Amino acid sequence: MDDHNLEEFRRHWQEELAQSQALRRRRRLEAGERRSPRRPEAGARGEPASGYLGLAQGLLEGAGRPPAPRPGRGGDRKDTSSRSRSPPDRDATEPEPLVDQLIRDLNELDDVPFFDVRLPYELAINIFQYLNRRELGLCAQVSKTWKVIAEDEVLWYRLCRQEGHLPHSRFSDYTCWKLILQECLAKEHTLRANWKNRKGAVSELEHVPDAVLCDVRSHDGVVIAGYTSGDVRVWDTRTWDYVAPFLESESEEEDPGMQPYVSFVRINSSLAVAAYEDGILNIWDLRTGRFPIFRFEHDARIQALALSQEKPIVATASAFDVVMLYPNEEGHWHVASEFEVQKLVDYLEIVPNTGRYPVAIATAGDLVYLLKADDSARTLHYVYGQPATCLDVSASQVAFGVKSLGWVYEGNKILVYSLEAERCLSKLGNALGDFTCVNIRDSPPNLMVSGNMDRRVRIHDLRSDKIALSLSAHQLGVSAVQMDDWKVVSGGEEGLVSVWDYRMNQKLWEVHSRHPVRYLSFNSHSLITANVPYEKVLRNSDLDNFACHRRHRGLIHAYEFAVDQLAFQSPLPVCRLPRDIMAGYSYDLALSFPHDSI
């Protein structure tokens, strides 16, 4: 019964479909006759492929446009032309669906011949070595072959060295240089955030109790300081448990308790140099011991001292003489060159990377001298009535500030000279106040920073001879300044140390101490500042106590912003006085500087 009903339903359904198709065909014929009454035979023929679908199928099959119908005389010709315009049999040539055609075209685009070029691996590495890390990442997404080349360890090792990370490492030290570069970039980002947020550790270096601070310098985290007691002390701020030694002098054994003041101190990676008020110069080798390896004596007070940061070369200025000292082939120190100048020297610097013969720059009043070890003193700049107020040198240029005096007042300027051509390249500034400090050695390329007594810090663009940025920094004038690729650190006469983000023209933070900031130096992760008093005389209300009060002796601060390198298990790095030293027995230091671990 069920099978009979199913067959009957199928028969009725097919009849309905046939009737509906016949009805639709009849309606189309009637509509065609009404539209074109002159050609009633066209609808009778019923061309099945006269629409756009037939045209599209013909194009896909490779055929051109169907030919236009030609008028014929008889019914035979009409039947022949109708059969010629009809589409081919579906069983003979099955047309490809549009979706399959699209997929086939996309598959043809996958294999680009440019990516399949077979190059030697070494040649591909030489081509890819000129790309930065962003471009290498884009190349790694092109194909599997390019990904292997873009992730080669040699490329990432070179890229890591080019960006200044791990400069002393070798290729065999690590196995994945791409990961090492990512870690270095993450640390750099953390360091920059710590600088901006003032997040890190601050250390006040141990003082000499019965002396006043005279001069401070540092090199790569190693700090040297000289005091009115004649003591010279060295700290290594890279380690918290380092005990700062005193550098002994030969005069201490001869006349104990009668030490002259320390006028200047300088330090590099291997040497420490100190100049005293009585004209004595001591040179220590930091790798051998605490006693000087060379002693030189001038007839008068030493007015300027310079030490090369790369080589063991020392230059001193006393009275009207400038002396250059460096060791010979056997290691014995001697006077290599001696120059005579017309006026007392105010500033003295040694030019870095000068080759075999050292070169120094000295300013004496309104004279600027170029001193070469194999030549006599030559005048680099001279304008009567315009004395030099500051000096700094780089490998190829020298910058110094001049004070404009006389009948024609042109404003105070900074002059930049080429050491090779010995001529003036730029005249910068034109300020009302005196330029007190300038830094071209540590500045980024084509930039220079200066400080002025008019309370402003200026960033100069050496390419356009214009002031790129001017910051109102310190109320009593700027005394020290340094910049890098994004920040400026300045110190003032009022004892304020300020950190600026000069790209945003914004002050990040500042710290204050009692005495003027005479020295500051920073690198990527640390900052050294020194507040040196004006007065070098001991003052204490208690005559029985010869210890100088803390507010008169000066301060040295060391800031460390790479907190991941700090050992917080050590005692609080605010003060490094051990328990057996009673330097502050006359006043309470226990609350401010605890010794116990926290």
From Swiss-Prot:
This is F-box/WD repeat-containing protein 8. The modification N-acetylmethionine is found at residue 1. WD repeats lie at residues 201-250, 259-299, 300-340, 341-383, 384-429, 430-475, 476-513, 514-561. It holds the Pfam family F-box-like. PROSITE patterns: FBOX, WD_REPEATS_1, WD_REPEATS_2, WD_REPEATS_REGION. GO terms for cellular component: 3M complex; Cul7-RING ubiquitin ligase complex; cytosol; Golgi apparatus; perinuclear region of cytoplasm; SCF ubiquitin ligase complex. It comes from Mus musculus (Mouse). Widely expressed. Expressed at higher level in skeletal muscle, cartilage and lung.
